[in-house]
């Protein structure tokens, strides 16, 4: 059975995107090791509410590592110290008694702070609206099974489609680049017959929108790949670059 731990929790507080932020420090006592990180935040918020204080605002939804909304920067890592896991999949057993845990929001010009630990990630939605879809007629439901796709290609497309759009890649990147996200969304369609028809338009449109929204460029530090909770490979960025160059040559 996991032991209870006590630790110091430093949490970033900020009223809005234009306001100056600061850290608040809390002493957490006897938190069970099998408590998830978000459950620990719930415990803290319950204490704050009981004391008549403002609870900490943070984003969450499924709490199962699927939705990507639990965007917290924990001790210098997007989603915390674990590999291949989101914040909601982190348990307090990963920390030691007496630790100091620092929690911040994603830091990026493309993700302005809404309040405290919650950021506005609607920029990703705008990038997807620019071209992250198939608009051509692809036939009825049975037709998909009639199109042969080699298993290695299907596997690559599925690996790219594992991206949950959480924004950890942007938070990890020193340039605030969204290239891993964009490349995953481009790759999952460019690899399949249904997506090839609009491949050129898609690559140009999504990269253009990424630049327009203030995200930086990729300089191959691979920090995004190291911190991605779904282990999306930067080989997708190479594919995106090939797709973009091929599209520009057709202009």
Question: What spans do the regions from the language model cover?
Answer:
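Eukaryote-biased recognition of intrinsically disordered, low-complexity regulatory segments
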Residues: 4-27
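Functionalized membrane-embedded alpha-helices
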Residues: 66, 72-74, 224
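Short, contiguous acidic and Ser/Thr-rich linear segments
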Residues: 24-36
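Short, structured protein-protein interaction patches enriched in aromatics and acidic/basic residues
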Residues: 57-69
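Short strand-turn-strand beta-turns centered on an Asx-Gly dipeptide
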Residues: 12, 29, 74-76
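Ferredoxin-type iron-sulfur electron-transfer modules in oxidoreductases and energy-metabolism complexes
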Residues: 35-54, 101-251
